[in-house]
């Protein structure tokens, strides 16, 4: 984006903001008022950043002009030169802030999320690691004040999880957690290891935006719903009614099975919630892939097939391989203190997008 088009863009945004302000003050009502109010609210953040940027630019121009005054004494000149240096230092940061606010928004960022964790290679140790990851995200949600609800859980005999999913509700949850999708690897000495050897195992994390009926319409004709008796460990039936539910979305082949609740109705409701999220994410993935093909580049660092992070317990370190960030704070991270990684991943994503402008 060249300087002229960047400046023109800012002028247009400020103009639109003023027009919306006048429109809202003119006494409009109904749907027109709702639409204008939303547009106005959506622009408030970027307008505030543009005004700060324009103010700094104007102050810099004024200071440079004042510096040319022949009657200035030495002390005043030094004061002006210091002000110019400070303004010149702040402008790139303010400009970057504006450009980031101008980046196309991911429509899913404001949504709540569904997180799914599956034990990967490593047997029982992988299942224990999956449980530890699940607890880590649950703790992170608590620290953020988000609502955390377990949707389904498939436990092993010694406290591990073969597979587990949860709904995390709150503002901008998906924007924070979307970069957690991928293969997480752990290196540690299992409690059952008598020789003290380090084992490596893995778990897969998938983060999906939680969607409502308005986002994904599920037609009855597109769904195949099977019911069956819930079974426990070893395959024995734990319920005398057909409370377990399996729903298949015929057009995509996506299937969700749930048996956690004793009520078939509750299992169906939870299964539909997960199904909507998976279909929505599949549509997002296809759109991302189309954009990637158009630009002849790979999009998205959340590819679930790639190893994204390693948790090394003997060394007390956690390494994110996408951004080459290593923190020697494994206890804090496992206890839900993820912001340092999450903020770095968001900044990395913004930098990539800015380089494409």
UniProtKB/Swiss-Prot annotation:
| UniProt-recorded Gene Ontology molecular function terms | translation release factor activity, codon specific
User: Does the entry annotate any disulfide bonds, and if so which pairs?
Assistant: none
Q: Where in the cell is it found?
A: Cytoplasm
User: Region Disordered: what ranges?
Assistant: 284-313
Q: Does the keyword Ribosomal protein apply?
A: no
Q: Report the domain of life of the source organism.
A: Bacteria
Its keywords, alphabetically, are:
Cytoplasm, Methylation, Protein biosynthesis
Per UniProt, the ranges with Basic and acidic residues bias are 284-293
InterPro entries, per database record: PCRF, Pep_chain_release_fac_I, Pep_chain_release_fac_I_sf, Prokaryotic/Mito_RF, RF-1
Check the record and name the Pfam families matching this protein: PCRF, RF-1
Q: Indicate yes or no for the key word NAD.
A: no
Note the HAMAP family from the entry: Rel_fac_1
Biological role: Peptide chain release factor 1 directs the termination of translation in response to the peptide chain termination codons UAG and UAA.
Which family does the entry's similarity section mention? Belongs to the prokaryotic/mitochondrial release factor family.
Q: What is this protein called?
A: Peptide chain release factor 1
């Amino acid at each position: 984006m060249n300087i002229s088009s960047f400046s023109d863009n800012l002028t247009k945004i400020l103009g639109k903001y003023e027009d919306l302000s006048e429109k809202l003050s003119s006494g409009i009502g109904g749907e027109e008022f709702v639409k204008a109010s939303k547009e106005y609210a959506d622009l408030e953040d970027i307008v505030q950043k543009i005004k700060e940027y324009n103010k700094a630019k104007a102050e810099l121009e004024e200071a440079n002009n004042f510096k040319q005054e022949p009657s200035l004494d030495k002390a005043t000149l030094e004061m002006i030169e210091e002000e110019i240096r400070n303004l010149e230092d702040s402008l790139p940061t303010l400009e970057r802030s504006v450009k980031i606010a101008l980046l196309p928004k991911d429509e899913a960022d404001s949504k709540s999320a569904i997180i799914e964790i599956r034990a990967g290679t490593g047997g029982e140790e992988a299942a224990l690691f999956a449980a530890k990851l699940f607890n880590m995200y649950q703790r992170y949600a608590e620290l953020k004040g988000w609502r955390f609800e377990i949707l389904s859980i498939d436990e092993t005999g010694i406290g591990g999880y073969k597979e587990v999913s949860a709904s995390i509700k709150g503002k901008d949850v998906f924007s924070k957690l979307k970069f957690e999708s991928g293969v997480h690897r752990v290196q540690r000495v299992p409690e059952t290891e008598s020789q003290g050897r380090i084992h490596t195992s893995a778990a897969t994390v998938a983060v999906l935006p939680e969607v409502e009926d308005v986002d994904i319409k599920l037609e009855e004709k597109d769904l195949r719903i099977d019911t069956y008796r819930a079974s426990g460990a070893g395959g024995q039936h734990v319920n005398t009614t057909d409370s377990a539910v399996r729903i298949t979305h015929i057009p995509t082949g996506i299937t969700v099975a749930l048996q956690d609740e004793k009520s078939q109705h509750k299992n169906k409701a939870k299964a539909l919630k997960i199904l909507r999220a998976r279909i929505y994410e599949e549509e997002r993935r296809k759109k991302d892939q189309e954009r990637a093909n158009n630009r002849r580049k790979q999009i998205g660092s959340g590819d679930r097939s790639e190893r994204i992070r390693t948790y090394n317990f003997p060394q007390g370190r956690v390494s994110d391989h996408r951004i080459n960030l290593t923190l020697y704070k494994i206890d804090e991270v496992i206890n839900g203190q993820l912001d340092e990684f999450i903020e770095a991943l968001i900044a990395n994503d913004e930098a990539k997008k800015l380089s494409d402008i």
